[in-house]
């Protein structure tokens, strides 16, 4: 085991290099770290370590376990590591002052500062994110982004038992609330001692900007309401998203829908997602143009994308807000029984929108994906939701990130796809494949046996996985990209002028 003093010196050295602290802070920081380890003396160490940031942090955690300061459990190790890094961080007010000082130079400089801080303080878990499998694969709609999510570690049985028997608390109310800033964490609630948020004014309300601890794409940020209020899609959503992109034109911003099945995983707290990433949907081609009376300054088109999406372009924020709101209101009450689209069942609302906003070539671009959460006997989880035949790949809600063409697939697929590759190489029998994958594996075998002389196996499986994800998205499209669906899509866009 490494010497504690040497590890502390190494972490301080790394943090100075990462601009978390300055040389002047060395003695103070060292003493605060010693206190965490119940030590009240320090002897300089001749040994100079060259460990990486995460290696150093992990060795410090090992010492804390050895000294019985913490349990050897994931939640307590995470809490302790956040306590360590919190020592290196300024208070929220100081971080906000620095952010806006840099914002006066440029919006990008301010987000670069905050993103770097969030990584250097270990709030963004870059070590765990690095475990994800990411690749791009072609499809009939363009190149898709595929991620097999391996970043979130699984809890061990002991930790699950502790969580089951723990006292329930309503503080913080949810994972997004402002009360998470600096929160110690428990066995049931993640550590947030090293968590900081930037205060934003959007549409005369206070919002918070933070980065996701488990990034799915570059600079994946969350914009959350100061108040714990439910998700909603209305005219204020469009105002907020456009206001955010106006303030940070190098970022996109979007919202999950506000209804179950087609919404995100957290419907209880109003929030948006954003970041500095170009998604496959951004490059989707035009399907057809249309116009909306009274909005001559707004370009309108339907795009060729598996989830039925209207794209608006314009320079005037007010016009885009009003045009988006008109489309939302029309869609809320729109039914087309020939395509299984019903706006209401009794008093239950089914229609909503997944919106995204970005700035491109001096114009704002607003993408409005039309969603419907109705269920049926044939499709009890949702008519416009991944159907049973694709559940072996993805059965969870299709939210904003997936709508834009980035698949976030379960970690179990890593081993399961390797088995499928072994089957395609005739190394194992079909019985060794998980039962829910067998129909797909048989289908792949027929294709691969025909193509294998000219096709790389990994590329083949990646492309087929991408195609399966495209099927997931196609199931969610309310207007299918066939003759009947296109006619239906045009009936809806025509209704915008009635």
Curated annotation (Swiss-Prot):
GO biological process, one term: galactose metabolic process
Compartments in which it is found: Cytoplasm
Keywords associated with the record: Carbohydrate metabolism, Cytoplasm, Galactose metabolism, Nucleotidyltransferase, Transferase
GO cellular component, one term: cytoplasm
Pathway(s) served: Carbohydrate metabolism; galactose metabolism
Catalytic activity entry: alpha-D-galactose 1-phosphate + UDP-alpha-D-glucose = alpha-D-glucose 1-phosphate + UDP-alpha-D-galactose
Family: Belongs to the galactose-1-phosphate uridylyltransferase type 2 family.
Official protein name in the record: Galactose-1-phosphate uridylyltransferase
Lineage, opening ranks: Bacteria, Bacillati, Bacillota, Clostridia, Eubacteriales
Encoding gene, per UniProt annotation: galT
């Amino acid at each position: 085991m490494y010497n504690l003093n040497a590890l502390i010196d190494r972490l301080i050295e790394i943090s100075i290099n990462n601009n978390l602290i300055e040389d002047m802070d060395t003695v103070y920081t060292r003493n605060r770290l010693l206190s965490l380890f119940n030590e009240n003396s320090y002897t300089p160490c001749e040994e100079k370590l060259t460990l990486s940031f995460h290696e150093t942090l992990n060795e410090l955690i090992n010492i804390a376990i050895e000294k019985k300061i913490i349990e050897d459990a994931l939640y307590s190790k995470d809490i302790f590591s956040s306590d360590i890094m919190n020592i290196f961080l300024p208070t929220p007010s100081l971080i906000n002052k620095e952010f806006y000082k840099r914002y006066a130079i440029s919006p990008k400089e301010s987000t670069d500062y905050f993103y770097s801080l969030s990584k250097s303080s270990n709030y963004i878990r870059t070590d765990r994110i690095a475990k994800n499998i990411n690749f791009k694969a072609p499809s009939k709609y363009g190149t898709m982004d595929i991620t097999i999510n391996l970043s979130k570690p699984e809890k061990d049985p002991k930790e699950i038992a502790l969580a089951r028997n723990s006292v329930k608390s309503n503080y913080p109310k949810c994972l997004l609330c402002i009360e998470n800033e600096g929160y110690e964490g428990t066995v049931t609630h993640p550590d947030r001692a090293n968590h900081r948020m930037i205060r934003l004014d959007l549409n005369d309300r206070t919002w918070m900007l933070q980065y996701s601890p488990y990034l799915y794409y570059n600079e994946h940020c969350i914009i959350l309401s100061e108040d714990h209020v439910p998700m909603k899609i209305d005219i204020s959503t469009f105002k907020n998203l456009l206001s955010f992109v106006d303030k940070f034109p190098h970022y996109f911003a979007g919202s999950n829908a506000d209804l179950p099945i087609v919404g995100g995983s957290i419907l209880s707290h109003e929030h948006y997602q954003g970041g500095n990433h170009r998604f496959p949907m951004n490059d989707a081609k035009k399907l057809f143009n249309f116009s909306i009376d009274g909005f001559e300054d707004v370009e309108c088109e339907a795009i060729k994308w598996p989830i039925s999406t209207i794209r608006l372009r314009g320079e005037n924020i007010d016009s885009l807000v009003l045009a988006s709101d008109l489309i939302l209101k029309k869609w809320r009450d729109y039914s087309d029984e020939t395509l299984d689209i019903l706006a209401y069942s009794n008093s239950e609302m089914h229609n909503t929108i997944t919106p995204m906003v970005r700035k491109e070539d001096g114009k704002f671009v607003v993408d409005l994906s039309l969603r419907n959460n109705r269920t049926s006997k044939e499709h009890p989880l949702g008519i416009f939701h991944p159907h049973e035949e694709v559940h072996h790949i993805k059965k969870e809600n299709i939210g904003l990130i997936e709508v834009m063409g980035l698949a976030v697939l379960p970690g179990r697929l890593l081993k399961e796809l390797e088995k499928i590759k072994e089957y395609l190489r005739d190394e194992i029998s079909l019985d060794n494949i998980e039962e829910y994958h067998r129909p797909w594996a048989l289908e792949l075998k027929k294709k691969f046996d025909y193509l294998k002389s000219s096709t790389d196996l990994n590329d083949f499986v990646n492309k087929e996985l991408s195609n399966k994800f495209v099927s997931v998205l196609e199931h969610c499209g309310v207007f299918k990209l066939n003759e009947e669906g296109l006619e239906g899509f045009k009936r809806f866009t025509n209704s915008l002028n009635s």
